[in-house]
Every structure is written in structure tokens, then in C-alpha cells.
């Protein structure tokens, strides 16, 4: 069997900033969810079957619960997605108002460019792309790149200020 990685991301900084505490389990708008690896792989393969256009930012699966499905968030304030990039391809430079915190799952020969600076990837590293930074991801390797990204996108979604644009 393979090992496991526990990567924990919460909205605790937001709660602390506002002086709040997490709601009791019975009152929370968050559901426990489980996404089996086989289903994630199946969905990712389906995405790759769809032709990529110039207005496509990349290949991604967005994770959500039944109660958060309408906003496409995993929590009211957080968005979680598995992004992917085919071997030998580069993602078109873009920006958005939310921060992007990424866990590199598979990324040999991959890197990101953030505000003109190259950041090489390493396995299981966490990278941070600041809000509004122009960035792109590049796969110079021979395998599909996989990176799990959490963003404070829920806040921007509810305020209608996502600010996504190609650079």
C-alpha cells in the first residue's frame, strides 16, 4: 500500500480575524464528504475527453457537498479543486482575486510562473499564489500534472467579485 498525506486547510484565520468560533457540528453549513480516488480519476478522464478551447483556464474537478453545490464550494468561504495539466502543455497566464494555495501531487518537470518569477515544483510541496498575481502553470514533464488547490473563492463568489481574467 502507498502512504498517505494529511493536508489540512481551514478557514480558521478568517474566524480568528472576525473573533468568531466554528459553529457546533449540528449547526454548521458544512457536510463531511468523501471522494473516492477511482471516481476522481474517472471524472478527470472525462474532462480530458472534452476539447480544450482558448477560453479554457485548465482541466479541473471542483469538489463540493450537497449543501454547497450551488456555489461550487467545499465550505461557504473556501473552494477546493483538483487541477491538472497534460504533459508538454502550459496554462494560459491569468489572475483572480482569491489566493491559491496548492499541494503538488504529481508534478515532475513542472513549474509555475508568478508575476514573472519561475517557481519549480517538488512533490508534496505547498505553493501560494497571492491574490491578483498574474500566474501560469507549465508541464515540461512526461506525466499529467496534478495539484490540489484551495482558494478563498467562496468569499469572492458571494460578493460577485471573482475577478478572473486572462492576462
Where do the model's predicted regions map?
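A short, N-terminal "cap"/entry segment at the start of jelly-roll beta-barrel domains
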Residues: 16-81, 163-167
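A short beta-loop-beta micro-motif enriched in histidine and acidic residues
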Residues: 72-79, 86-100, 116
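A short beta-strand-loop-beta hairpin characteristic of the jelly-roll/cupin
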Residues: 1, 95, 99-123, 161
Amino acid at each position: 500500500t502507498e502512504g498517505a498525506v494529511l493536508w489540512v486547510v481551514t478557514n480558521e484565520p478568517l474566524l480568528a480575524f472576525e473573533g468568531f468560533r466554528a459553529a457546533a457540528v449540528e449547526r454548521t453549513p458544512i457536510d463531511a464528504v468523501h471522494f473516492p480516488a477511482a471516481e476522481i480519476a474517472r471524472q478527470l478522464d472525462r474532462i480530458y475527453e472534452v476539447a480544450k478551447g482558448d477560453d479554457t483556464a485548465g482541466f479541473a474537478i471542483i469538489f463540493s457537498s450537497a449543501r454547497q453545490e450551488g456555489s461550487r464550494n467545499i465550505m461557504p468561504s473556501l473552494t477546493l479543486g483538483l487541477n491538472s495539466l497534460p504533459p508538454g502543455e502550459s496554462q494560459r497566464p491569468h489572475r483572480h482575486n482569491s489566493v491559491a494555495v496548492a499541494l503538488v501531487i504529481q508534478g515532475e518537470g513542472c513549474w509555475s510562473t508568478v508575476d514573472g518569477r519561475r517557481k519549480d515544483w517538488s512533490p508534496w510541496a505547498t505553493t501560494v499564489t497571492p491574490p491578483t498575481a498574474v500566474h501560469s502553470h507549465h508541464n515540461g514533464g512526461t506525466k499529467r500534472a496534478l495539484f490540489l488547490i484551495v482558494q478563498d473563492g467562496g468569499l469572492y463568489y458571494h460578493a460577485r467579485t471573482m475577478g478572473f481574467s486572462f492576462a
